[in-house]
From Swiss-Prot:
<dbReference type="GO" id="GO:0006777">
    <property type="term" value="P:Mo-molybdopterin cofactor biosynthetic process"/>
</dbReference>
<feature type="binding site">
    <location>
        <begin position="103"/>
        <end position="104"/>
    </location>
    <ligand>
        <name>substrate</name>
    </ligand>
</feature>
<feature type="binding site">
    <location>
        <begin position="37"/>
        <end position="39"/>
    </location>
    <ligand>
        <name>substrate</name>
    </ligand>
</feature>
<feature type="binding site">
    <location>
        <begin position="126"/>
        <end position="128"/>
    </location>
    <ligand>
        <name>substrate</name>
    </ligand>
</feature>
<dbReference type="Pfam" id="PF02391">
    <property type="entry name" value="MoaE"/>
</dbReference>
<dbReference type="GO" id="GO:0030366">
    <property type="term" value="F:molybdopterin synthase activity"/>
</dbReference>
<comment type="pathway">
    <text>Cofactor biosynthesis; molybdopterin biosynthesis.</text>
</comment>
<comment type="similarity">
    <text>Belongs to the MoaE family.</text>
</comment>
<dbReference type="InterPro" id="IPR003448">
    <property type="entry name" value="Mopterin_biosynth_MoaE"/>
</dbReference>
<feature type="binding site">
    <location>
        <position position="119"/>
    </location>
    <ligand>
        <name>substrate</name>
    </ligand>
</feature>
<dbReference type="InterPro" id="IPR036563">
    <property type="entry name" value="MoaE_sf"/>
</dbReference>
<keyword id="KW-0808">Transferase</keyword>
<dbReference type="GO" id="GO:0005829">
    <property type="term" value="C:cytosol"/>
</dbReference>
<keyword id="KW-0501">Molybdenum cofactor biosynthesis</keyword>
<comment type="function">
    <text>Converts molybdopterin precursor Z into molybdopterin. This requires the incorporation of two sulfur atoms into precursor Z to generate a dithiolene group. The sulfur is provided by MoaD.</text>
</comment>
<comment type="subunit">
    <text>Heterotetramer of 2 MoaD subunits and 2 MoaE subunits. Also stable as homodimer. The enzyme changes between these two forms during catalysis.</text>
</comment>
<protein>
    <recommendedName>
        <fullName>Molybdopterin synthase catalytic subunit</fullName>
        <ecNumber>2.8.1.12</ecNumber>
    </recommendedName>
</protein>
Length: 150
């Protein structure tokens, strides 16, 4: 069984199943899971839905490279990255990043690192449906700044 699970999918993910997989080894003392959701407000406008596109194969390659970098920097045992694509509604879960390790510090830092790099380096494109119409979402300056701490 591999220690990395990466999926780009349209269907919802099962947080409980991911947690069970991440934490099933007895050497694991910490499991950190981040779940991102579609917000109902962005840039001052009400958001009703979000459409996510990706570049198949290239996206998975980028996610694998990000996870590989995290595994070099921290002593982590298992990683799960699931990112949804397609049409999502307000409140839907978009992304899950889960990391397990013997110690919480490694799990926390690796999880944040993976999420920060996923936001800026993985080829996903987001189009929001708002009360003002449709718009493509540009990368935020705060996402770029988050990379600088690493």
């Amino acid at each position: 069984m591999t220690d990395i699970q990466i999926a780009v999918q349209e269907q919802p993910f099962d947080q409980n199943a991911v947690y069970q997989w991440l934490s099933e080894q007895h050497s694991i003392g910490a499991t950190v899971i981040f779940v991102g959701k579609v917000r109902d407000l962005n840039l001052g406008d009400e958001v009703s839905s979000l459409y996510l596109e990706h570049y198949p194969a290239m996206t998975e390659k980028a996610l694998n490279e990000i996870v590989a970098q995290a595994k070099v920097r921290w002593d982590i045992q298992r990683v799960s990255v699931i990112h949804r694509v397609g049409l999502l509604q307000t409140g839907d879960e978009i992304v899950l990043v889960g990391v397990s390790s013997a110690h919480r510090g490694d799990a926390y830092h690796a999880n944040e690192f993976i999420m920060d790099f996923l936001k800026s380096k993985a080829p996903f494109w987001k189009k929001e449906q708002t009360n003002q119409g449709e718009r493509w979402i540009e990368a935020r300056e705060s996402d770029k700044e988050a990379l600088e701490k690493w």
